[in-house]
Regions:
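Terminal amphipathic alpha-helical/low-complexity segments used for targeting or macromolecular assembly
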Residues: 1-55, 172-187
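Extended, non-globular alpha-helical segments
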Residues: 43, 47, 90, 96, ...
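Left-handed beta-helix
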Residues: 55, 60-61, 66-67, 72-81, ...
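Regulatory activation segment
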Residues: 106-115
Length: 187
């Protein structure tokens, strides 16, 4: 029902289960994550890569994902190993939740937080890149093709390269499809 509430094209639960690649990717991730936590990393990676082959969505088995993640259109989404995603998050196609550049000592980096933390009720537009161990506050909106490299405040709307806040209103209010007509540039 959370997908039907966020996607006007969703006609029935059956069509969502059978035809939405994001639903399949999240299901496979939950299975892969189970094996990852249990220490069966190879099995987890095989499940993850099989899911990627069938859905076009790559979610590392180590990523932590909350309830009701909706990946709409999905193709090209990449979610890195130390990513954390809150509840009721919507992600559109070609989004990357990626790590910052590798350090000289990649062994050291294996045990560090390298990917973003996404709060509850966030919407991430198509093509957006959220890079490094940044935090995106709850109810934030990341515009299409924005590049986020710094923390994002709660309820902010971020646009541009690098992303900048254009709106800080309605704190804590969930707006499934984005912004009002009154978008202010706060530069």
């Amino acid at each position: 029902n959370s997908i039907k509430a966020r996607d006007p094209a969703a006609k029935s639960i059956l069509s969502i289960i059978l035809t939405y690649p994001g639903v399949k990717a999240v299901f496979f991730h939950r299975v892969a994550n189970f094996f990852h936590i249990a220490g069966f990393d190879l099995i987890a990676r095989i499940i993850s890569q099989t899911s990627r082959f069938f859905t076009g969505i790559e979610i590392h088995p180590g990523a932590k994902i909350g309830k009701n993640l909706f990946i709409d259109h999905g193709m090209g989404v990449v979610i890195g190993e130390t990513s954390e995603i809150g509840d009721n998050v919507t992600i559109y196609h070609a989004v990357t939740l990626g790590g910052s550049s590798p350090s000289v000592d990649t062994e050291k980096q294996r045990h560090e937080k390298r990917h973003p933390t996404i709060g509850h009720d966030v919407v991430i537009g198509s093509g957006a890149q959220i890079i490094g161990p940044v935090t995106v506050g709850k109810c934030a909106r990341i515009a299409a093709n924005a590049v986020v490299v710094k923390d994002v405040p709660e309820s902010a709307t971020m646009i541009g390269i690098p992303a900048k806040a254009v709106k800080l209103e309605n704190k804590g209010k969930f707006r499934p499809y984005g912004v009002d007509d009154k978008v202010k540039d706060e530069q």
